[in-house]
Amino acid sequence: MSSRTIMAFDFGTKSIGSAIGQEITGTASPLKAFKAQDGTPNWDDIEKQIKEWNPDLIVVGLPTDLHGKELDTITPRAKKFANRLHGRFGKQVELHDERLSTAEARADLFEFGGYKALSKGNIDCQSAVVILESWFENQWS
């Protein structure tokens, strides 16, 4: 197992959550939620985070329905976001199924912090954690 640093994003049209993790431990931590306008973040803010953490790989959650089918409205936009990350920063980017990540993130946050922990930014960042930890699990199976 390598010791790569991996960054993950949970794409949304109003907010984009992020997380960072280490492949060797398979663990991830929430970073920051970026405000977005119709899916477009402030790219300067994203750049600052990428420069600070210098990830070896970026994982972007791929929104699908419960059967794994792409969603007409949001899936293409998440793919476009992933392509822009690669184009702007030259980092390898992978898409990863994010089914049920928000539900799992809400449950995790509620368990440790109750209703007060359920802010939109916290949920989006925890969703990025769930996406990244799921990606780690897939690498090991």
UniProtKB/Swiss-Prot annotation:
GO cellular component: cytosol
Enzyme class label: hydrolase
Alphabetized GO MF terms: nuclease activity
Protein's cellular compartments: Cytoplasm
EC number(s) reported in the record: 3.1.-.-
Single GO biological process annotation from the record: rRNA 5'-end processing
The keyword Signal is assigned to this record: no
Keyword annotations of the record: Cytoplasm, Hydrolase, Nuclease, Ribosome biogenesis
Superkingdom of this protein's organism: Bacteria
Coiled coil: none
HAMAP family the record matches: Nuclease_YqgF
NCBIfam families: RNAse_H_YqgF
Protein role: Could be a nuclease involved in processing of the 5'-end of pre-16S rRNA.
Protein name, per record: Putative pre-16S rRNA nuclease
